[in-house]
């Protein structure tokens, strides 16, 4: 499905960025998976339900929702 494809692309993108700075342990991988799934589901809801947010606000909220432990390895 498109959702699974998007998940894999986003997960792989962030995983590669993180791996340039550290080894991904199981806890960090859990946070990454949770963030990627959540981001995709919220974006999907935004499209399907015609949410009131403009795209810039949505992007900013997705960035803000990233766990601090991930942010330290990803330059946003």
Indicate where each model-derived feature is located.
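C-terminal peripheral helix-coil segments that are non-catalytic and often amphipathic
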Residues: 16, 36-41, 45-76
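Amphipathic alpha-helical packing segments from all-alpha helical-bundle domains
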Residues: 1-21, 26-41, 71
């Amino acid at each position: 499905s498109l959702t699974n494809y998007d998940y894999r692309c986003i997960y792989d993108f962030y995983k590669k960025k993180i791996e340039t700075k550290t080894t991904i342990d199981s806890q960090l991988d859990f946070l990454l998976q949770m963030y990627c799934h959540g981001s995709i589901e919220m974006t999907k809801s935004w499209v399907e339900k015609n949410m009131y947010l403009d795209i810039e606000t949505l992007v900013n909220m997705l960035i803000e929702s990233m766990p601090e432990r991930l942010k330290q390895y990803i330059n946003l």
